[in-house]
Amino acid sequence: MLMVWILVSYWYMKYVEVVIYPPRNLGEKNMGAGLTAYFKSEFSNWGKGETIWLFSASAVILGLSLYWGDSLLGIIAALTGVWCVVLTGMGKSVCFVFGIVNVLCYAYISYGAKYYGEVMLNTLYYFPMNFVGLYIWNKHTNKETGEVDKRHLTNKKRLIIALGSIVAIVIYGVILKHMGGNLPYIDSLTTILSITAQILTLYRVAEQWILWMVVNAATIFMWGVNFAQGNENIAVLLMWMVYFLNAVFMYYRWSKEAKNNEI
């Protein structure tokens, strides 16, 4: 936790105050005021539908998790995960702050379930990439809308990404099978596509949501099997269900907004 705080503090002092809200006098900058201004900006100008969706999903997860007696860690992972993906869809850079907490909690839960691909994905990839995302998205946030500018890929780039992902899934699946992991090829699929989707997220392209749909569907199956085996991870299972529905909605929104911005 100390390391997390150090990294967050470093990012804040270097990018939030200097890049987003540069003070008039750098020698007299007020860290508290800058942080307040940042979060005020991130949590303003929300659409009515998105706000209802975010709080409704959070309430359902919290209520059912408490009913089923899920662990506190599982509930924290689920709630921070939901806030992360919804805020990602809204184009708010603060999504990565929630993502940092989520990946640490989720990695611990995945280790207990022997989903080693998920553990490595979250600790070795998602965790550092959340800090990268904070930096990149802040640089490309539209000051008028408070959201990142959205784009979409050419057909050629879509084909290259699809073929490369298939090859990587097969290779990594073989590796996980030899490690003795549960559902190695499903685990591999979610890991490889998650890596690819996260890169597309950093580049702010609409196609990321297609990959997230596939990842979420496969992961729902994976955690459904885990829950059916008697494990108390209902919060995590519900989290992935919300992820899937969110990806469908956000793909429609991003595709519409990125229609004339091809890369």
Outline where the language-model segments fall.
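Short, hydrophobic transmembrane alpha-helix segments
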Residues: 61-72, 90-91
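N-terminal membrane topogenic signal
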Residues: 39-54, 154-159
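Hydrophobic core of alpha-helical transmembrane segments in multi-pass integral membrane proteins
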Residues: 52-65, 158-175, 244-247
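Short, Lys/Arg-rich, polar N-terminal cytosolic tail immediately upstream
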Residues: 23-44
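Membrane-helix interface "capping/anchor" motifs
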Residues: 86-97, 199-211
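Membrane-proximal helix-loop-helix units in multi-pass membrane proteins
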Residues: 125-193
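C-terminal transmembrane-bundle signature of multipass membrane proteins
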Residues: 201-263
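Hydrophobic/aromatic-rich structural module bridging two neighboring secondary-structure elements via a short loop
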Residues: 88-136
